[in-house]
Amino acid sequence: MLPQEIVYTKLSSTETQNGWIDFLTTKPLASQGIEWTPLIPTAHVLSIFMVLFMIAILTAVYYTKLKKLKPTEPPTGYVLVVQLLILQFENLTVDLLGEKNRRLSLLFIIIFVYILISNLMSMVGGIAAPTSSSTVTFSLGLMSFFGTFIMGVKYQKLAYFRDFFVIIKIKKKTIPLMINPLNVIGYFAPLLSISLRLWGNVLAGSIFIALLYSLFRTFFTLWSPSSFSVGLVFGTLAGGLVIPAFHVYFDILVSAIQAFVFVSLMLTYWSQPIKAAENAAEEKGQQMIENQRLNVK
């Protein structure tokens, strides 16, 4: 279901006879017949393929322009913007994940562009933004979740699983006593946080914009009940003059911010096991140096 469908209801002259009373007591959610249909494709499926198609076009255009660019000619326009984006994410990836993981910057660029375009799809009337579906945001969150797990196993090996247990020491040996439920819950918390943050912001923005359009239409139709169609036309025109300013904030600025925040959090989660492994190696090295000093004495 589109976010707009949650807000919009069919208006008629009979619904406006009692003025604001009928408007305030209307229950659009009940009239929509909302029910869970897990195996039936939703409107988001089409918009997902549209986003992928747009990304493919943008990639093809960049490749074509880059191929035509001479080696001595500085990049300009679209090529320059893309290369600045690539450079920015490469630096961010190297700073948080290290030089060895520079190649992963391409993955984060793709995720950023995918989320950005998905968020901007809400500006197209009748098309659902993919990120307004909790399924899409949780799928993206799972990428962050499993990526964190892979990084932990890669850099910390079996020591990564120590945080999930209550450890006791017996004769200088560490023995896992029981599962630590707080740490296990804390491990799944970022998955819920990063997924719900993106989904909630995009869905709330779409619903807010739809409410504004509905407010203008309803106000003008109630203002001129004798001519419902004239009021509807004036309400649509008034909304078209005022609401674009809100589109700039909710659909453009917030879309870019949410895409960057998601990727930044994903990078942060992936970097935590790497930093933990580096800190453990540093402590081990300091302990070895201290032991050597004691042996010399």
UniProtKB/Swiss-Prot annotation:
Gene3D superfamilies given in the database record: ATP synthase, F0 complex, subunit A
Gene: atpB
Superkingdom, taxonomy of origin: Bacteria
Annotated organism of origin: Mycoplasmoides gallisepticum (strain R(low / passage 15 / clone 2)) (Mycoplasma gallisepticum)
Listed transmembrane segments: 38-58, 77-97, 107-127, 133-153, 174-194, 202-222, 230-250, 252-272
Subcellular compartments: Cell membrane
Membrane topology: Multi-pass membrane protein
Subunit field text: F-type ATPases have 2 components, CF(1) - the catalytic core - and CF(0) - the membrane proton channel. CF(1) has five subunits: alpha(3), beta(3), gamma(1), delta(1), epsilon(1). CF(0) has three main subunits: a(1), b(2) and c(9-12). The alpha and beta chains form an alternating ring which encloses part of the gamma chain. CF(1) is attached to CF(0) by a central stalk formed by the gamma and epsilon chains, while a peripheral stalk is formed by the delta and b chains.
Name of this chain's protein: ATP synthase subunit a
UniProt xrefs under NCBIfam families: PRK05815.3-3 (NF004485)
Annotated Pfam families: ATP-synt_A
HAMAP family from the UniProt entry: ATP_synth_a_bact
GO cellular component, one term: plasma membrane
GO MF annotation, one: proton-transporting ATP synthase activity, rotational mechanism
An example Gene Ontology biological process: proton motive force-driven plasma membrane ATP synthesis
Keyword terms, alphabetized: ATP synthesis, Cell membrane, CF(0), Hydrogen ion transport, Ion transport, Membrane, Transmembrane, Transmembrane helix, Transport
Predominant location category: membrane
